[in-house]
Curated annotation (Swiss-Prot):
Keyword Repeat: yes
UniProt record similarity statement: Belongs to the NPA family.
Post-translational modification (record): Nematode polyprotein allergens (NPAs) are synthesized as large polypeptides that are subsequently proteolytically cleaved to active polypeptide units.
Record-linked InterPro entries: ABA-1_nematode (IPR032487), Aerolysin-like_pore-former (IPR053280), ARM-type_fold (IPR016024), DVA-1_sf (IPR038289)
Native species: Dictyocaulus viviparus
SUPFAM superfamilies: ARM repeat
Name of a matching Pfam family: NPA
GO MF term (any one): retinol binding
Name listed for the protein in its UniProt record: DVA-1 polyprotein
N-terminal signal peptide: 1-21
Function statement: Has high binding affinity for fatty acids and retinoids.
Propeptide stretch(es), residue numbers: 22-60
Length: 1557
């Protein structure tokens, strides 16, 4: 059995049988609704057909044309519909009896009679309908008759199911072959090629699936006994059961079953149960070592072919010498020929062994005679094993017909010692004279090449007379054929003869090559030397003769790129040295060639590798490699697969050649591969992983594209030069690049191992060590070198990440701080900081930084404050932990003061147990308190009147004492204008050093001091934050105007540049300038009024109304200078918003297509994206929405799911943009509260109706309409696919009993995608719920069960469950019925989800029922102490033992047995105690209320019989069947105890049976 034959299972699509539904069974309502019969037509198609309604033939042809354009899956569904629709007219004109006869003809598959009979009813139609039937007759005939072939119908139905794992291209290829009428074997061969290119794990998974399909089919044709055997036996034994089932069939069914049996034969044996394999190996191969047994087990586990497994067994067997080897061979031989006992007598078998010692050919003939006596199924099995068995039995015996036994062994041992080639062909040389043989031996012993020996043989042969030559040729021809007969089955022999007769030499050579692998090593050695002679004698053209191609031909074909001098050099090496030296020289010449020659050399040598590789590995294996490459396998994965294939070669010479060739070709391919990658990958790399570079940097890298080392170094240089957000982006992209390239080099499997380490939380060092180990295992030197280069860069990148996100205990590096938090320092200050850092005095370091911060002024101060605050957030959070960091953020968001936050930080630091870490945290906290204190003061000063003392101390140190005194006098008069003028007067009069010192401060300080507390925002700030979109020339112009002091001209120039901007620059400018407007206007009107403006915007108020409100607020400003500035800014901003509005209108409300394609339309293919861009450019937004919806409707499977997620996200984004954050939050709350989609939709409409801007409202309505459709489709998609219900829904409706912490745990597990783990966690939390919360949890989870189970099994099945519940069925019975419904689901994914839900729900329902049952359980220990004290110790022990064995029903019988054995006082004591027990337990079962009623009856004096009857009636009202059964059982015992006679009990039981009925 060959593992590759598993692919034959994809052909099961031709043969799986399912229930056949008659075409005369009209159960589809659409058959009678005209509007539904052609709903597949598009509106455009319907319109076109409408124009042809008066031209019936053209209408029919056009309809069929449209119909044939449908997707295959959709067309298949409609085909079934139209098959019945074609004959639905019969329902109106034929009686039930007549339709019954048509069904009989259909079941008999009598096509001609069926069609004749159908159309015999046509005359009963009116004339119009007759014409319709006639018009469509040809088409309908095809539909009606093609359904009659069950095999064809079923194969079409299941074809997709069995080839789902193929790529679309492969599926199409299979369908094309099927359509073209290709044979079973041809399709099988193609499918096997695809299958073998899959990973081993994927192959194993598919084999398991196909095996289940096989079993399912055979259980349909098996009887009940056989079905049980199929369920319980191992796969190998099932095959024998199957054969009996198939043998009973007849006709077409049998023909089909035989094909199924052939296809499934390997599957039902491909992987026997592990225990069976272990047992077989231990029993039949006991001579093996444990290690060898493990190897064989692994071969079974991997699904390797029986041929491979036998070859490995033979290899192990060949390695055993001495008595152990003899015993092992004897054991194998016994197992091999055990079957003979079934068909031959002991005498015949003994005679066979004698014959074996003298005549091998006669022995083989006799064995085949015995095989002929076997049943057909056993015969096939034995023939498959025969080559292997004969290999064992005959390997130590030579040809007894030609020489003595001992001589043979002598030769064999010589061969083992030094591989004598002459010995290998000696049976072909028995015509030589002794002296000629001696001459050949001399040549061989001299060490000459064996070709010299062959040349001498040819010379001797040439000396023979012609008659002798003819005689020898006939003999040789027979000898050439003998080895084939020895290893081939009879079926294979027939195939070989047919191939030979038809001159199908290509397939014949492949078959012979396969058979050679069954030979012993000595036999292969022989074939190797006589192959060409034999093929010549049999007139077979050796299609593999290429490997004998002369060096000259090879030079022309593959080495034409060499110079004449190089060619002469390699020729000389070829003739004088070994092949490895020859190959090395070729590589050396290639690598030293110029680029153009090297490219040609690579191309030629790759062709040589394909050519010779096919010769060595075989066409089939090369196809596997080709398919792997086509499917995107990495170079390393392909390389590893080639190594595996070579390892499987058993011929040592061929294997050696293969290794040599592989080594050479890997180098050639790696050179070509790397060159291709350089050309293809570099632009790809720039687009994916180096977007953080600017254009000049990218261009510089392009000039180095042929030098990886330089590129890596330059990237690191650029990377080291980045800071802030650019640095973070660079880290993120380069990490992705590292993951991608390392994976491409080491392969999928190793990459998964590395990923696993990361997920397990291993350190960067451990992960790096693992990567190094994996790279070191790469055999190809060039690939390993490339991997090492990439690793160096990646270590560097991940090192930076480690510094950015390192463990809390590590000291953050100065380099990181300089890049992110200390950029405001001057170069001199940085040098000071570095020197302190180098001596490792952290305390002094913090103090010095704070000193520099205190000395900073103006913009430097602002920048320092911002960066140091960021540093505080980063480092303190790093030291106190993520959770505490989040808590501080919440405090800040809730309005806590800095003091309160600082106090909380100190508490957290005190809780740190690590002394070193706590000290670091304390240092950082102390500095940060100062930073936040200074920042707060600085901000306060910034927003209030700056005092003169501060100014004199910090900014006017250049004044003399007299000037300072004058300023103080003016300051006290509160004449700020006079104060400003005086400062400028002093400044203008300054000279020399004083003037220089003043000038340094004038830009950042003096000017600020002059202005009011809402400082005039300087140009540098604007250029950094709001004018980054300007080019250098524009910025220069801005600076010139700014220096002139003309602010009006400055605003105009900004607007001029903005108006002139286009495309992305315009978009960026709009964003930045609007941000500037918000910032400056807020600065002028104050926070409170700015907040009101923000609320207006979010409420959808128009831009015009907002503008008016801003004007009102500005009018309220009392400071005229400030008001003038505010008006100037407002005027400019109105223009900016006007332009932005126009721009937004032109570009679809700022939501441009590029944004949408990147965020919400990634599921579109390139062609669809192109269509979208074309429509977008036309400006037709309505068409754009329609096109998106059209694509969405047409999407299927995973694409549909992804589209639903993205489009819903887009809806949330855009609708929020139209209705504002506040209203969007309300919508979100409604959704989380479980409000229906319809209600949410209404609320959105209400909010849109409140928008006053008509244009904005129109856009919002358009978006809303599209979103309703999207949510509708998504809802359908969920409903159609019984979606995996989302967690938000569950949390809101069914899991509200959980604490926040528990919900967080469940969300975290849910986020991993592991639904089973999610269910398990919910059940774990449910089991641990306190008793007071249990009822709520149980109620919610039961509601969830009803909801989800309904979703899975459907309304109809749910109605059945509901009916069972209402009729009093137990939870167990209901659970079993739900399991039946779930088992009937076809969708495997849906079934798995349903099974998970059902399993959890059984536990949930079990809680209440279990509690109920436990309430009614009799406590045996309590019963013994209260009601069974009359038992002796031995009897009590027996009762307890029954309890421990859980034989509770037997306990009652045993007690009554003991009761019957008592007498006298013991009997009375027992009766009294048991009566008390009866009262107690009956009360327990029927309840307090019913027990009270029974007591009243008893007190009224009714008879025991009447009382018993009443108890029986009461028991029968118990709803729970299990409890009712227990109560009945107790009552039956109590009747005996109370002395009710059997006859009386019978009367009472009549009533009991009435209730049962």
């Amino acid at each position: 059995m060959k593992s590759t034959s598993f692919i034959t299972l994809l052909l099961l699509s031709y043969f799986i049988v399912e229930a056949h539904s008659s075409i005369f069974h009209w159960d589809d309502e659409r058959l009678f609704k005209h509007d539904d019969t052609h709903s597949w037509l598009t509106d455009v198609q319907k319109a076109e057909l409408e124009t042809l309604k008066h031209q019936p033939i053209q209408l029919r042809d056009k309809t069929l044309e449209f119909y044939n354009q449908l997707p295959t899956n959709e067309k298949a569904i409609w085909d079934k519909f139209y098959t019945k629709y074609c004959v639905v007219w019969l329902k109106e004109v034929a009686s039930d009896e007549e339709i019954g006869k048509l069904k009989e003809l259909e079941s008999e598959k009598n096509k001609e009679a069926l069609l004749t009979s159908i159309y015999s009813f046509k005359d009963r139609l009116d004339e119009v309908d007759q014409r319709k039937v006639e018009l469509w007759k040809e088409t309908c005939d095809e539909y009606v008759t093609k359904g009659l072939s069950r095999k064809r119908r079923d194969s079409n139905k299941n074809f997709e199911e069995f080839i789902y794992w193929m790529t679309d291209e492969q599926k199409q290829s299979m369908n094309d072959m099927k359509t073209a009428g290709k044979s079973f074997n041809e399709i099988h061969k193609e499918g096997r090629k695809y299958f073998k290119a899959l990973t081993i794990d994927k192959q194993s998974s598919l084999k398991e699936q196909f095996k289940d399909k096989c079993k399912k089919y055979f259980m349909q044709i098996a009887n009940s006994d056989e079905v049980e055997k199929i369920k319980s036996l191992n796969d190998d034994e099932i095959r024998h059961v199957v054969k009996n089932a198939v043998a009973r069939l007849n006709g077409e069914d049998k023909e089909f079953a035989v094909k199924m049996e052939t296809l499934c034969e390997d599957v039902l044996a491909f992987k026997a149960r592990k225990n069976d394999i272990d047992d077989k190996i231990n029993r039949r191969l006991s001579w093996m070592t444990d290690e060898q047994k493990q190897v064989v087990k692994q071969l079974y586990a991997d699904g390797r072919s029986q041929a491979d497994i036998r070859a490995k067994i033979f290899e192990f067997l060949s390695s055993i010498d001495g008595p152990a080897g003899v015993a092992a061979k004897a054991q194998i031989q016994k197992e091999c020929y055990k079957w003979m006992e079934e068909v031959a007598t002991a005498e015949e078998i003994a005679a066979l062994h004698e014959l074996h010692e003298i005549d091998h050919d006669g022995c083989r003939r006799k064995v085949r005679e015995f095989i002929g006596r076997l049943p057909e199924d056993r015969k096939l099995e034995v023939e498959k094993d025969l080559p292997f068995c004969e290999k064992i039995w005959y390997r130590d015996h030579g040809d007894h017909n030609s020489h003595k036994h001992g001589a043979h062994h002598h030769h064999r041992h010589l061969a083992v010692r030094r591989r004598r080639h002459l010995y290998a062909i000696e049976k072909f040389l028995d015509w030589l004279k002794p002296e000629q043989k001696h001459e050949l031996e001399k040549i061989e012993n001299s060490g000459a090449h064996f070709d010299d020996v062959i040349a001498e043989v040819k010379k001797f042969y040439g000396l023979l007379p012609e008659e002798k030559k003819i005689e020898l040729k006939a003999k040789f021809k027979s000898q050439c054929y003998d080895w084939v007969k020895e290893v081939a089955t009879s079926e294979e022999m027939n195939d070989i003869m047919k191939m030979h007769e038809s001159k199908n030499h290509s397939d014949l050579m492949k078959r012979l090559t396969e058979l050679e692998n069954r030979l012993t090593e000595d036999q292969k050695h022989t074939i190797e030397h006589v192959r060409e002679v034999c093929l010549g004698l049999w007139e077979v053209q050796n299609t593999n003769k290429q490997h004998k191609q002369s060096l000259e031909e090879a030079m022309d074909a593959y080495l034409s790129w060499m110079t004449d001098e190089d060619k002469e050099k390699v020729k000389a090496i070829y003739e004088t040295s070994n092949r490895q030296t020859f190959y090395d020289e070729i590589l050396k010449i290639m690598e030293s060639s110029e680029d153009e020659v090297k490219a040609k050399a690579t191309e030629k040598l790759e062709a040589a590798c394909k050519h010779y590789g096919t010769n060595i590995l075989g066409e089939e294996n090369v196809d596997i490699i080709r398919e792997m490459k086509k499917n995107g396998a990495t170079f390393e994965e392909i390389s590893n697969r080639v190594d595996e294939l070579i390892e499987g070669i058993t011929d040592s010479d061929r294997k050696e050649k293969a290794y040599r060739m592989s080594k050479l070709c890997k180098k050639i391919y790696s050179l070509g591969h790397s060159k291709q990658l350089q050309q293809y990958d570099f632009e790809n790399v720039l687009q994916k992983y180096l977007t953080w570079l600017d254009d000049s940097q990218k261009n510089e890298l392009r000039t180095m594209s042929d030098n990886k080392e330089k590129i890596y170094k330059k990237i690191i240089d650029y990377f080291d030069g980045t800071i802030g957000e650019v640095k973070e982006k660079a880290v993120e992209e380069l990490q992705l690049a590292c993951n991608h390239y390392i994976k491409s080099i080491v392969g999928e499997e190793k990459a998964m191992e590395i990923k696993q380490l990361k997920e397990e939380g291993k350190s960067s060092e451990e992960i790096a060590k693992k990567v190094e180990d994996v790279i070191n295992q790469i055999s190809d030197e060039s690939i390993r070198s490339r991997a090492d280069e990439a690793l160096l860069v990646c270590k560097r990148i991940f090192g930076i990440v480690k510094r950015l996100r390192r463990d809390n205990s590590e000291i953050h590096s100065l380099e990181e701080a300089m890049e992110r938090y200390l950029t405001w320092l001057s170069d001199d200050q940085k040098i000071v900081i570095k020197s302190i850092y180098d001596v490792n005095d952290r305390k002094v370091l913090y103090e010095k930084i704070m000193e520099f911060f205190d000395d900073a002024i103006g913009e430097t101060k602002q920048k320092a404050a911002k960066e140091l605050k960021d540093a505080c957030k980063h480092y303190v959070k790093d030291l106190i932990g993520e959770e505490n960091g989040n808590l501080l953020r919440e405090m800040k968001e809730n309005g806590a003061s800095n003091e309160a936050i600082a106090t909380k930080v100190e508490e957290m630091i005190e809780a740190i147990t690590d002394e070193t870490k706590r000290a670091q945290a304390m240092r950082a906290s102390t500095s940060c308190r100062k930073v936040y204190g200074v920042v707060q003061r600085f901000r306060r000063d910034h927003h209030h009147e700056h005092n003169l003392d501060e100014a004199l101390e910090k900014h006017f140190t250049w004044l003399n004492e007299e000037q300072k005194s004058q300023l103080k006098t003016i300051y006290e008069s509160e004449d700020r204008e006079a104060l400003h003028k005086k400062v400028w007067e002093f400044f203008e009069a300054g000279a020399g050093l004083r003037a220089s010192n003043a000038s340094k401060k004038i830009y950042g300080v003096a000017k600020r001091f002059r202005r009011d507390h809402h400082h005039e925002h300087n140009l540098d700030e604007a250029l950094e934050k709001y004018l980054t979109w300007l080019n250098e020339e524009q910025k220069s112009q801005m600076k010139t105007i700014y220096e002139s002091g003309d602010r009006e001209a400055l605003y105009k120039k900004v607007l001029e540049f903005f108006e002139a901007a286009t495309g992305e620059v315009k978009e960026k400018a709009a964003v930045e300038l609007k941000s500037a407007c918000r910032h400056y206007i807020k600065d002028y009107i104050g926070d409170e009024k700015a907040e009101k403006i923000k609320e207006m915007k979010e409420s959808g108020v128009s831009t015009e109304e907002i503008s008016k409100k801003v004007d009102e607020f500005i009018a309220m400003i009392t400071d005229d200078e400030k008001k003038a500035k505010a008006l100037r800014a407002s005027s400019a901003c109105k223009k900016i918003y006007g332009v932005a509005k126009r721009f937004r209108r032109d570009h679809h409300h700022e939501h441009n297509l590029e944004e949408a394609l990147e965020k919400y339309l990634t599921w579109l293919n390139e062609e669809q994206k192109s269509q979208m861009k074309t429509i977008y450019e036309s400006g037709d937004r309505e068409a754009l929405y329609k096109k998106v919806l059209e694509f969405f409707e047409a999407a299927t499977g995973e694409v549909k799911e992804k589209a639903a997620v993205e489009l819903k996200s887009a809806c949330r984004h855009y609708i929020k943009d139209y209705i504002g954050d506040e209203k969007a939050e309300k919508i979100k709350e409604m959704k989380e509260s479980g409000v229906s989609t319809e209600e949410i939709s209404k609320k959105v409409d209400e909010f849109i109706a409140m928008i006053t801007d008509d244009e904005k409202k129109a856009k919002a309505l358009r978006a809303s309409n599209a979103c309703k459709k999207i949510y509708g489709v998504a809802k359908r998609l969920r409903r159609d696919h019984h979606h995996e219900h989302n967690l938000e829904e569950a949390m809101g409706k069914y899991l509200s009993w959980m604490s926040d912490e528990q919900q967080a745990q469940v969300k975290k597990i849910y986020g991993t995608g592991d639904r089973l783990a999610t269910y398990n966690k919910v059940m774990e939390l449910f089991e641990s719920v306190p008793s007071d919360e249990k009822e709520k949890a149980t109620s919610q989870l039961k509601a969830a069960c009803r909801h989800y189970i309904k979703d899975f099994i459907g309304k109809d099945n749910l109605a059945v469950i509901k009916e069972m519940k209402e009729s009093g069925a137990t939870n167990e019975a209901i659970g079993e019925k739900i399991d039946e419904f779930i088992a009937g689901l076809d969708d495997e994914q849906k079934k798995a989800q349903a099974q998970r839900a059902a399993s959890a729900c059984k536990k949930i329902y079990g809680v209440k029922s279990r509690k109920r049952r436990e309430h009614y359980e009799i406590d045996v220990d309590e019963a013994i102490s209260k009601y069974l004290t009359w038992l002796n110790e031995e009897q009590k022990a027996e009762i307890k033992q029954l309890k421990e064995k859980d034989e509770k029903q037997t306990i009652g019988k045993k007690i009554m047995e003991f009761f019957e054995l008592t007498s006298g006082d013991d009997k009375e004591k027992a009766r009294e105690q048991l009566k008390a027990a009866c009262k107690h337990y009956v009360k327990m079962y029927v309840g307090e209320e019913k027990a009270a009623e029974l007591k009243k009856l008893k007190d009224s004096g009714i008879s025991l019989e009447e009382m018993s009857k009443k108890v029986t009636e009461t028991i029968e009202t118990i709803e729970d069947e299990a409890v009712r059964a227990k109560a009945r059982r107790i009552h039956s015992y109590c009747q005996r105890i109370f002395g009710i006679t059997k006859a009386r009990r019978h009367l009472a039981m009549k009533h009991h049976r009435f209730y049962d009925d």
